[in-house]
């Protein structure tokens, strides 16, 4: 699982790279300015669509992108302990 908390548009590339490798991605946009967050979401949703990945909102401005059904309970637990969700 890769957690991406983008500070710039170029950081969105980490989403596509991780998904192509089959890793789950948690996209944490909580600290990302709204205009940038929208651009990154548009890009990430496009990547998810192209790769037949699932997108789930797991928290306030936090999204899970997976090429499997959903995050495992262990992954969710880790995100809770990190204060992401």
Where are the predicted features?
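Positively charged, small/polar-rich N-terminal and surface patches that mediate targeting and assembly
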Residues: 1-25, 30, 41-85
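Conserved catalytic core of two-component sensor histidine kinases
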Residues: 38
């Amino acid at each position: 699982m890769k957690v991406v908390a983008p500070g710039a548009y170029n950081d969105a590339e980490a989403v596509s790279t991780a998904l192509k490798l089959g890793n789950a991605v948690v996209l944490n946009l909580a600290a990302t300015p709204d205009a940038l967050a929208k651009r990154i979401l548009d890009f990430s949703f496009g990547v998810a669509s192209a790769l037949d990945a699932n997108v789930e909102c797991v928290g306030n401005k936090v999204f899970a992108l997976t090429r499997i059904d959903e995050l495992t309970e262990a992954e969710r637990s880790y995100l809770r302990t990190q204060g992401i969700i």
